[in-house]
């Protein structure tokens, strides 16, 4: 039998269990400091370990992975699938249990991208977190404007528009006169709403309102700057290493350049990690769960999966369902007849992800499917249009 190791990783400690050919376990506790991980690596190599398995415990496994991947084949395991028997759970027994399952070939590894994709993923997920902060700051700025009775957000398309931000900046710099603030409003908005714009800018701004508004505005500008820095790094990696894949994904309706970078950061460009498109869809959390007992289906809700990938795929599906003339728009409208809009959107996202899998696997561009009608469908259409023609002729 192969010599393997199972690791139970915590914030400050790592419990390692090595199972050798004689099945006598070697168990030792290590520090999560870099020196401790290096010591762990040296010990495993000296005992002839080739494969190491560990649980995906939060972010604690990441630095351990970075050090050990230089010398070992690593397997990251979802803790849900290797639960210990109740009443027998200790750190040492957890490490021993992982090593035992690994030695018997019963572990299924999670997808861990290579170093380059991990870097791209860090930038992408950082951008998502900043986008959430941006939304919260926009809401904070709107609340503070309403407290001052500045109602320009009722007429602008969104809080982060150039018009609103120019007015906020002017207020922060001390300008409170409605006539001067009105000059900063986009001409189209002024022409459309006229006198209401002037009235919406006649607010009551206290010193405390100005201070809080200025703080929120400064935070907002910082977030926008940090977003641009992350996008610049994402652009660099994708342009240097994934230009063909970016071009292929861009041919799919509803997927723009930023969406393509996000998708690649989450799934990579090599589909060998996913045996079929169904595995990828399941990993993304876009397939119905199997919850059946005694012939009764209890739930068909989508499974928990990669929240970052599922989020961007639903956004792309929403855009594709509104792309005029696209196959996705027709399919979405067809599904909405018998399903809720939300379920139809998930179905479109699932279909898009299956297409992405095929494009990345075959290295081809997207070609819109041609609607092929069966003989019965053609006959029904002929009858329908013949009936409409008869109605028009009778009207004359």
Please name every model-derived segment:
Residues 1-396:
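A detector of single, family-specific signature residues
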């Amino acid at each position: 039998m192969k010599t393997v190791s199972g690791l139970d990783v915590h914030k400050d400690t790592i419990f390692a269990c090595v199972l050798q050919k004689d099945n006598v376990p070697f168990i030792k506790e290590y520090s999560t400091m870099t020196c401790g991980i290096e010591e762990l690596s040296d010990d495993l190599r000296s005992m002839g370990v080739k494969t190491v398995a560990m649980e995906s415990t939060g972010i604690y496994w990441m630095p351990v992975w970075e050090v050990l991947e230089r010398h070992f084949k690593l397997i990251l395991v979802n803790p849900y699938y290797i639960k210990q028997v109740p009443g027998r759970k200790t750190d040492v027994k957890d490490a021993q249990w992982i090593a035992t399952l690994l030695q018997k070939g019963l572990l299924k590894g999670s997808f861990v991208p290579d170093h380059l994709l991990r870097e791209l993923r860090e930038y992408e997920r950082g951008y998502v977190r900043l986008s959430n902060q941006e939304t919260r700051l926009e809401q904070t700025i709107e609340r503070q404007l309403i407290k001052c009775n500045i109602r320009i957000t009722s007429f602008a398309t969104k809080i982060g528009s150039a018009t609103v931000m120019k007015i906020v900046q002017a207020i922060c710099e001390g300008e409170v006169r409605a006539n001067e603030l009105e000059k900063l409003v986009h001409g189209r908005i002024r022409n459309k709403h006229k006198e209401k714009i002037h009235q919406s800018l006649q607010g009551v701004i206290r010193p405390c309102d100005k201070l809080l508004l200025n703080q929120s505005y400064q935070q907002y500008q910082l977030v926008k700057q940090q977003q641009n820095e992350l996008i610049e790094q994402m652009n660099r990696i994708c342009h240097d290493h994934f230009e063909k894949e970016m071009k292929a994904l861009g041919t799919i309706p509803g997927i723009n350049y930023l969406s393509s970078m996000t998708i690649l950061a989450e799934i990579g460009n090599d589909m060998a990690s996913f045996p079929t498109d169904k595995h990828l869809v399941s990993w993304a959390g876009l397939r119905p769960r199997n919850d059946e007992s005694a012939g009764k289906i209890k739930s068909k809700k989508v499974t928990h999966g990669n929240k970052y990938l599922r989020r961007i795929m639903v956004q792309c599906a929403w855009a594709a369902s509104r792309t005029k003339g696209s196959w996705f728009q027709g399919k979405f409208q067809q599904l909405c007849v018998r399903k809720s809009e939300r379920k139809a959107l998930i179905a479109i996202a699932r279909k898009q992800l299956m297409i992405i899998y095929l494009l990345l696997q075959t290295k081809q561009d997207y070609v819109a499917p041609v609607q092929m009608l069966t003989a019965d469908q053609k006959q029904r259409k002929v009858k329908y249009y013949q009936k409409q023609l008869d109605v028009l002729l009778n009207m004359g």
